[in-house]
């Protein structure tokens, strides 16, 4: 009975998910024979996860009807829905509604895409000799580990499904429209994006979980203390407008809002990030979500638990006044020329196809005397129009009418003697338990628009 309990629970969760999306209730993976007995604590954990899959109350309360909170939110929601209309602009793969449907497709198909990878792992395991397999099963129970992974994929899939449903309500997408988009894409032989949905779950760790605190603490204190210093230059009742482009899942913007005295606008182009953000922003209490973001890869784990361990989020309630403006940073804020007191670019400027366009937009959106704070690497992507060294960036930015100001030693050591740019090591890896580390020597500066 013990040996079959996990499979029974997985079957229940799978049936629930299948009924929700109209697919077969049977798991796509074949169940292995002779599953080792589960320990009682593993059974308890699996039951809890299965309950989480089927209990909407454990996934956070959603605001009724997604009513915008403030006049600022209502105004932006109206503009967003106009941009999202199929008749707004040309219907191409870059249309925001098309990109949204692609993201919804991927979140809806999380289970199928990850179960296919698990099937591949199970097939590969069959290539091990009988003697080797016996050793593996007697010592570590490799098949049981794969079965545990399956159960946790279903937990993640339930959250991804809920994310998609939340987004469909927010953006007003009918199920038929999404079904038609998915059917056409799959008829054309395309597959839903597996990587982007997995990255969203990992970004939840970085932005909204206790486990992301180390990475946040390498950048956020520098930025937040600089903002407080700038705020001290103004009257106490002055509210400064702050823009954070490339905001991802938005935590930095919410921490800025929590300082008080700032009107915070965040901006993001990726619909995968925006769907994830809308879901997190809908949470009204802490630790409403439990998921397993590291079950999608076997590498760099010291223990099995490091791969399977749960993450709880959010570790703080999102600030209700933060406003997300979706779209291309260079164009979506065209009506905000000279509007912002401060622009904060955190791990952002090197994402530009045209770095000079980013610089132009920052200059255009800032008020005279406004500040631009940068914290991040210079890791250029594929096909950028221009790639500048730090020294070249300094010269170009000064030529555009910015003056560098010292941001202070909390933001690292001076990169160049005599130049007011600092360097600070910053990890970007999501998993503090992993046997690998990815870190940048982030470049930090503050400039004033003259």
What are these regions (language model features)?
Residues 235-248, 255, 263-268:
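Conserved class I S-adenosyl-L-methionine
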Residues 2-236, 240:
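N-terminal accessory segments
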Residues 356-369:
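A short glycine-rich, Lys/Arg-flanked "PGG" loop and its adjoining helix->strand segment in the class I
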Residues 400-401, 416-450:
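Core SAM-dependent methyltransferase catalytic element
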Residues 281-336:
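S-adenosyl-L-methionine
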Residues 330-343, 437-439:
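A short acidic, Gly/Pro-enriched loop at the edge of an enzyme's catalytic core
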Residues 291-296, 379, 383-415, 422:
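Conserved Class I S-adenosyl-L-methionine
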Residues 369-381:
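Conserved beta-strand signature within the Rossmann-like core of class I S-adenosyl-L-methionine
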